[in-house]
């Protein structure tokens, strides 16, 4: 990745102070999507990183993980599997709950979306605490999939999600990092 490409991607991500609550500096990846050159560069970096690793599925988490996971899956020539909030998937699902700052949330995946032995790459827009990807990883493994890699556009390393996911045996890759929360 050239410094020019990294600069293009990083500068396209807007920072919104005090959103969704006071004291948070929100990294808005939707501004990257508005810039076709930055969006394409992001997908191409992910393709270059993962093109020869033998993945059979790409899993993206709701909702912004879909925006990076689906085009990556197309470029890699593999299927894309969405992981969604409860009640959003039409076929039979399995669910995994996980802890939030205040309470819990749940994610679901179709029971037939991952086959035993599938080699899965998990993709999301941003890594903060790692809770969403930990739950996603548990779902994939419950269905017999092999998941050892997780890719993100943005990592907020001070929050520690990368360490949490490494503790699950995942190799974590992010295109860019930002300080703070």
UniProtKB/Swiss-Prot annotation:
GO cellular component terms given for this protein: cytoplasm
Pfam families linked: Pribosyltran (PF00156)
The enzyme's E.C. designation: 2.4.2.7
Record's keyword terms, sorted: Cytoplasm, Glycosyltransferase, Purine salvage, Transferase
PANTHER family according to UniProt: ADENINE PHOSPHORIBOSYLTRANSFERASE
Major localisation: cytoplasm
Assembly description: Homodimer.
Species lineage: Bacteria, Pseudomonadati, Pseudomonadota, Gammaproteobacteria, Vibrionales
Catalysed reactions, semicolon-separated: AMP + diphosphate = 5-phospho-alpha-D-ribose 1-diphosphate + adenine
The organism of origin for this protein: Vibrio cholerae serotype O1 (strain ATCC 39315 / El Tor Inaba N16961)
Protein name (Swiss-Prot/TrEMBL): Adenine phosphoribosyltransferase
